[in-house]
Structure formats: C-alpha cells, structure tokens
Amino acid sequence: MLSPEVRALVKATAPVLKEHGEALTRHFYTRMLGGNPELRQLFNQGHQQSGQQQQALAAAVAAYAEHIDDPSVLLQVVERIAHKHVSLGVRAEHYAIVGKHLLASIREVLGEAATDELIDAWAAAYGQLADLLIGRERALYAAAASRDGGWTGWRAFKVVRKTPESAEITSFYLAPADGGATPDYLPGQYVSVRVYVPELGLMQPRQYSLSEAPGMPGQLRISVKREAGSPAGMVSGTLHNRINEGDVLDVSPPQGDFTLDAEDGRPVVLLSGGVGLTPMVSMLNHLTARDDGRQIRFVHACREAGVHAMKEHINALAAKRPNVRKAVFYERVGADDRRGVDYDYEGRVDLHAIRDEVILPDADYYLCGPLPFMQAQRRALADLGVAEHRIHAEVFGTGGVA
C-alpha cells in the first residue's frame, strides 16, 4: 500500500508526464533495448520505429500517475496488458529490467526536478503496478497451461491450409506440429504468432484474432491483412509472401479480454471495419452454432468489393437464419457490385440510417476496427441512446491486435 506522501509525489508528476511523456518513453526504450538487445524480439519493431509504442507507453504512465489514488480505475487497462504480456511470454524477471530503465530515464530526462524523494516514490509506485501485473499474469499462465490441449510460451504449429479471403486478407489454418490437441478459447480472443523477419534479423511477434469459432478440432485459424509499407507490414508481408502450407510458426496460447458474452441470451450487434471483422466472424459463427434464436446483426465496413473478406460465408448465414441480418457498407461501389448481395449500403457506416435494424432492446454491441472507425461508431451509439456498459470494443493497433 502506497503512503499518502508517495501518492502525492507521483500524482504531482502527471502534468509533467503529459507534456514530456514521449521524450521520456523514447529515452526509456533506447536505453533499455540498447542495454538488453534480446528484448527487441519482444517488442513490435514497426511500432517502435513509427513512435506508436512510445506514445502508448507515455499515455499509460501519465494515466497511472493521474489515478494513483484509485488505480482500480485502470483495472480494465491492466487486464488487457496482462493478456498481451502472456501472449508474448513476458515473465516476472522482465519487470526488474523495465523498472531499472524507467527510473533511470525519469532521472535523466527530468534532470534536477527528479529528486531522490521523487525517484523513491516512483520506485514504490512502479513496484505496486509490477506486482499487480505479475500476479494477474501468473494466473493467466496457469489457466493457459491447465486447459486440455493448453500450453505456455511458444508452441510450433504447422500451416495446414492457406486460403485467400480477399485481395488483402489471407486465412492460415494452424495445427500443432506435435500432433497434440488445441485448447478451447473464447470468441474474440487472439494468439501471438512469431516469425523471423530477415529485414530486421529478428524474430517478431504479432497478435492475430482467432477468426473461427471455438471447437475446430485440432486447428486454429487466423486471418491476416497484408499491411502496406515498412515497417508496418514486415510481419504480415512475411506471412503472406514467405509462409506456405507445410511451414511452421511459433504460436502463443489464446489470450485476450475482448470476448463474447453468449450466456445471457441478449441480442448481439457486431460492428466491424476492415480486418476488424476477424473476431466478429468468430463470434458470429459461435452464436449461430448455438442456434438459440437471439437476434444478431452483422454490420461491416470496407472500402470496396476487392477487399471484402468472407462475403459468401456471411451471406450464407444471413440467408439461412432469419434471426441474422447483415448490413455491409462499401465506400466505393463498382459497376458490377450487386446491392443486397455484395453490399447493402454505399458510403461509410451510418448507424443513424439503419437505426431500426441495429438499435435493439438490451442488445450488446461489439466493435472492432481502426481507431477512427471505432470512435465514430461509439459516438453514434451514444447518440442513439446505447448505454456505455453495453459497448465492448477492441482497437486494432498499438495495445490491440491485428
């Protein structure tokens, strides 16, 4: 338990961290990865080069300082971080390394303002946060290992099937190389996949949603969008261009707190943008397999027909089941695109225009996609009277999955 004096000192640094947080985190990563180059394989080097990782850490450190009097406000964030850490293989011993370089960076960046008293306060605050994360991660590791077919760390999986879903998205069907079982998981969860990236000379992990419902015997499926450019697309490009059927990938156990609550029977509205449809398809397949008659809406946005993944599968489910309705938006409609078959609406997703279809009593809303898409849909749902606790979201990007 932190003393009132420690909490006051840490909280007093929140404005400074908001102003200088990115300088601090840039210095921190340079210092830590320079002294511990083996850790480069834990971190997304694309996000390191773009600055996204530094921005995310700066925001997290400032938020922790701001809410140090009541860190329970940040429990959802802590839960999300813990799941990602377990998928990456972060261990308790890594926290000592991070703490050493974080405290040294605070002293070096803040200069004379970083008194011994302030550094001691931040050491205590960091210790509290580290203990919280280590404890939660220990429980997640134990749960992953105890499931039938479960494991911890990296496990070799063979690509048994590689299927294009659109011009940008390809599905990889993965089976354990040891011939063993795969564990059950929750719709919406993800795995980390680790590949060697020759351009970096490093193993690099990325998180990919499991795009099929739980229960596929002996296999897991991920559906990967080819990201443009470098460094953003280094891993997805490797998967698309260099990984073929028969090749072996390192895969983590399923993790993630963005999951479907299917037990209460409430209506479900699934809203996705681009490759954000991958966890939604897992949720949709799970719900339709349950066949409990609840109302289900599948709303999807994509740029055009060429990048519309899994169209035939979604159309078939909607045609077969009267409780499932779809609303697909194309930003650009081609001359050969058929309304009601290929797409349903032209332009960007407009929930106000389809409010009679998607605003259902007591419904749960699941959102996944790029940040601007997510922000727009959250605002629209709030405008339409949907309670905040009914909205569940996963952002694809830093801190999220892809």
UniProtKB/Swiss-Prot annotation:
CDD domains: flavohem_like_fad_nad_binding (cd06184). Residues 1-138 form the Globin domain. The record marks K84, E394 as: Influences the redox potential of the prosthetic heme and FAD groups. It catalyses: 2 nitric oxide + NADPH + 2 O2 = 2 nitrate + NADP(+) + H(+); 2 nitric oxide + NADH + 2 O2 = 2 nitrate + NAD(+) + H(+). Signal peptide: none annotated. Its EC number is 1.14.12.17. FAD binds at Y190, R206, Q207, Y208, S209, V395, F396, G397, T398. GO terms for molecular function: FAD binding; heme binding; metal ion binding; nitric oxide dioxygenase NAD(P)H activity; oxygen binding; oxygen carrier activity. InterPro entries: Cbr1-like_FAD-bd_dom (IPR008333), FAD-bd_FR_type (IPR017927), FNR_nucleotide-bd (IPR039261), Globin (IPR000971), Globin-like_sf (IPR009050), Globin/Proto (IPR012292), Hmp (IPR023950), OxRdtase_FAD/NAD-bd (IPR001433). Heme b binds at H85. Residues 149-402 are annotated as: Reductase. The active site is at Y95, E137. Transmembrane segments: none annotated. NADP(+) binds at G274, V275, G276, L277, T278, P279. It is an enzyme of class 1 (oxidoreductase). PANTHER family: FLAVOHEMOPROTEIN. Consists of two distinct domains; an N-terminal heme-containing oxygen-binding domain and a C-terminal reductase domain with binding sites for FAD and NAD(P)H. Belongs to the globin family. Two-domain flavohemoproteins subfamily. This is Flavohemoprotein. It comes from Bordetella pertussis (strain Tohama I / ATCC BAA-589 / NCTC 13251).
